[in-house]
Amino acid sequence: MSGKDRIEIFPSRMAQTIMKARLKGAQTGRNLLKKKSDALTLRFRQILKKIIETKMLMGEVMREAAFSLAEAKFTAGDFSTTVIQNVNKAQVKIRAKKDNVAGVTLPVFEHYHEGTDSYELTGLARGGEQLAKLKRNYAKAVELLVELASLQTSFVTLDEAIKITNRRVNAIEHVIIPRIERTLAYIITELDEREREEFYRLKKIQEKKKIIKEKFEKDLERRRAAGEVMEPANLLAEEKDEDLLFE
């Protein structure tokens, strides 16, 4: 096993405990990222479905708005000059909010009306009904355009977040966890080898002590048989020592 396949660490019991904790942390992180990816994917599919529905509805609304414009021009004449003259500031404005999905911030756009209708009296002479219908249709078109912009922005943001999350999951699952597992296996192998070496060393020491003891006992028996070894004195025996007189 090369050093690139595992983490460079000195094999010990403490290192084994650390690697086990890191492995558990990596597995927990992978599981959390998978749950995050699933949540993002679910929201991604919901937004995709909503985009398709909104685009289909957008086509119908824009077609209806174009017909309303043609109808209003036919009934009320060319009112573009009146519209241009009454332009002061935007009556329809956009504000942005934020939505959080599994830690990913998604922008949400909303439209709102500000001020009074500058074209309230437009078409009072003729074509008032057609102009009112025209304003309603284009107001609906603006509403759908804002909603579509919000959905598409969220779609792109989620797509990028899902890719990043999946890359992290793959990195943890196929690089980090296997590397920690190989490091842990290396530590266990080294510790087992040390235990075997220590057991073999202790066994050899015991055998050597046994040989030395047997040799000593044989030598002692031989010397006893030859009368070279005196029996040890019994310190508990009741023997009287001779009196020593000092002159």
Swiss-Prot record:
Q: Which Pfam families match?
A: ATP-synt_D (PF01813)
Annotated localization: Membrane; Cytoplasmic vesicle, Clathrin-coated vesicle membrane; Cytoplasm, Cytoskeleton, Microtubule organizing center, Centrosome; Cell projection, Cilium
InterPro entries, alphabetized = V_ATPase_D
UniProt keywords, alphabetically: Cell projection, Cilium biogenesis/degradation, Cytoplasm, Cytoplasmic vesicle, Cytoskeleton, Hydrogen ion transport, Ion transport, Membrane, Transport
- Topological type in the membrane: Peripheral membrane protein
Q: Specify whether Transport is a keyword of the entry.
A: yes
GO biological-process terms attached to the record = cilium assembly; protein localization to cilium; synaptic vesicle lumen acidification
Gene Ontology terms for molecular function: proton-transporting ATPase activity, rotational mechanism
Give the CC-aspect GO terms: ATPase complex; centrosome; cilium; clathrin-coated vesicle membrane; extrinsic component of synaptic vesicle membrane; nucleoplasm; plasma membrane; proton-transporting V-type ATPase complex
Q: How does it assemble?
A: V-ATPase is a heteromultimeric enzyme made up of two complexes: the ATP-hydrolytic V1 complex and the proton translocation V0 complex. The V1 complex consists of three catalytic AB heterodimers that form a heterohexamer, three peripheral stalks each consisting of EG heterodimers, one central rotor including subunits D and F, and the regulatory subunits C and H. The proton translocation complex V0 consists of the proton transport subunit a, a ring of proteolipid subunits c9c'', rotary subunit d, subunits e and f, and the accessory subunits ATP6AP1/Ac45 and ATP6AP2/PRR. Interacts with SNX10.
Return the NCBIfam families for the record: V_ATPase_subD
What does this chain do? Subunit of the V1 complex of vacuolar(H+)-ATPase (V-ATPase), a multisubunit enzyme composed of a peripheral complex (V1) that hydrolyzes ATP and a membrane integral complex (V0) that translocates protons. V-ATPase is responsible for acidifying and maintaining the pH of intracellular compartments and in some cell types, is targeted to the plasma membrane, where it is responsible for acidifying the extracellular environment. May play a role in cilium biogenesis through regulation of the transport and the localization of proteins to the cilium.
State the family it belongs to.
Answer: Belongs to the V-ATPase D subunit family.
Name-wise, this protein is: V-type proton ATPase subunit D
> Which lineage ranks, top first, belong to the organism behind this chain?
Eukaryota, Metazoa, Chordata, Craniata, Vertebrata
